[in-house]
Amino acid sequence: MAIKKYKATKDNTITNAFKLDLNTRATGSNMGASDILEVFSIYGQQTTSSAELSRVLLEFPISNISSDRTAGTIPASGSVNFYLRVHNARHSEQLPNNFTVNVMAVSQSWQEGIGLDMESYEDETKESIEGSNWTNREKATAWAKAGGEYHSSSYVAGKTMPNYT
């Protein structure tokens, strides 16, 4: 079976995590220019109002995929499998052996942004700075729901497999 690879055309990490002062949420932060996509949830906070969450936004070239189906490069009808390959970046923090990543199709367009700061979350998108964040999908245009709106019928959950190379 032939394999066809598609790379994301844009990406961003958005979060509602607390900033270093532990009083302010980083809901305006943007990490669109970072070369790392950070997925986290603070242990023990998953069901509380103080939960700190992150979401990774990825956009793939859907028009290219559609064109490849029409051209017969990939099957024009029936099932086609898509796999998302991720890697663990080296860092000093301890990771759980196993955690679940949920993949959902975002239902609204969004801007990538130019933020880099994943520690103190100081790169914020505002009316004059493009990019998505926890509350806005672009500059000053809000998501339908904080944290991004997605198609609930397009949902996949999968376990990560540790890759310690």
Task: Identify the meaning behind each predicted range.
Residues M1-T165:
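Secreted, disulfide-rich extracellular signaling modules
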